[in-house]
């Protein structure tokens, strides 16, 4: 049995919440919290009679650490699932540390204000040292490792599909299928069609930031950076068909470069 606080009630969060409610023997109690409580209430009503999970809702501004601490201390969850925006990763991690609660998210931190002088100075130093210039990277959250270890807490980062399932596939392949993995290509395909000319795969602002950033990939121990969407490939996806896809920077490249010994190249493509 577990009590989980989910922060966020957008497209990704609503899917995750419904999946949790399907496993109601595991997720016995769930609190859905968002800046817009009405969205949380609407989802809770939609799930009435479809799950044994006890669902409550709350209003919270995830940019405000004090509000987060108050909510976490009030609800007393075993785990906080951060399925809000990546801008709020650090405030939610700080709140979890203050309250002694485990943490999980789906995407790594990036700042909302990329012109902030303090952040900019650290970012420009990282660009020179690491060799890629995307606004999002794991360095900010990996810096919390020691704090969580010393507190006896777990922080699981990037637990969506990509990042998330993609790394699990790679780890499984290395453990059970291969003695050595030299190259990894991750192909992210959206096969849906709602009749419109354009739609993002997730939060529009984050998705547009991602595709407009310089692309980068890992090769022979270092980053190679290219102009945005400069490398295009076509791939015949099973049950979907031919799709154009473009090389992007993506956070799981960072973690896979550290966790797959001897890997020579890692790339990420999105349709």
What does each model-found stretch correspond to?
Residues 49-64:
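Rossmann-fold cofactor-recognition segment
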Residues 13-14:
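N-terminal Rossmann-fold NAD(P) dinucleotide-binding loop
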Residues 72, 78-82, 103-105:
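N-terminal Rossmann-like NAD(P) cofactor-binding module of classical short-chain dehydrogenase/reductase
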Residues 61-77, 88:
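Conserved Rossmann-fold cofactor-binding substructure of NAD(P)-dependent oxidoreductases
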Residues 107-153:
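Rossmann-fold NAD(P)-binding glycine/threonine-rich loop
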Residues 36-39:
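Helix N-cap at the beta1-alpha1 junction of Rossmann-like dinucleotide-binding domains, i.e.
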Residues 9-10:
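Glycine-rich Rossmann-fold phosphate-binding loop(s) that bind the pyrophosphate
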Residues 175-271:
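C-terminal catalytic/substrate-binding lobe primarily of soluble NAD(P)-dependent oxidoreductases
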């Amino acid at each position: 049995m577990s009590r989980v606080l989910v922060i966020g009630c957008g497209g990704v969060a609503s899917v995750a919440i419904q999946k949790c409610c399907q496993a109601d023997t595991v997720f016995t109690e769930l609190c859905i919290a968002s800046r817009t409580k009405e969205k949380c209430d609407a989802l809770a009503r939609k799930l009435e009679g479809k799950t044994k999970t006890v669902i409550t809702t709350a209003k919270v501004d995830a940019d405000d650490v004090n509000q987060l601490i108050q909510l976490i201390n009030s609800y007393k969850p075993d785990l906080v699932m951060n399925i809000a925006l990546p801008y709020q990763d650090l405030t939610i991690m700080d709140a979890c540390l203050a309250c002694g609660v485990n943490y999980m998210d789906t995407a790594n931190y990036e700042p909302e204000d990329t012109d902030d002088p303090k952040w900019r100075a650290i970012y420009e130093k990282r660009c020179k040292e690491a060799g890629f210039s995307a606004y999002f990277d794991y360095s900010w959250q990996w810096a919390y490792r020691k704090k969580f270890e010393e507190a006896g807490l777990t922080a699981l980062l990037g637990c969506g599909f990509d990042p998330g399932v993609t790394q699990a596939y790679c780890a499984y392949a290395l453990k059970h299928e291969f003695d050595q993995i030299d190259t990894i290509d991750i192909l992210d395909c959206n096969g849906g069609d709602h009749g419109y000319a354009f739609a993002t795969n997730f939060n529009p602002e984050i998705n547009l930031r991602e595709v407009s950033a310089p692309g980068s990939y890992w090769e022979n121990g270092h980053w190679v950076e290219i102009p945005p969407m400069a490398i295009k490939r076509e791939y015949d996806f099973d049950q979907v068909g031919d799709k154009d896809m473009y090389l992007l920077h993506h956070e799981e490249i960072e973690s896979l470069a550290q966790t797959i010994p001897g890997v020579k190249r890692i790339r990420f493509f999105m349709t």
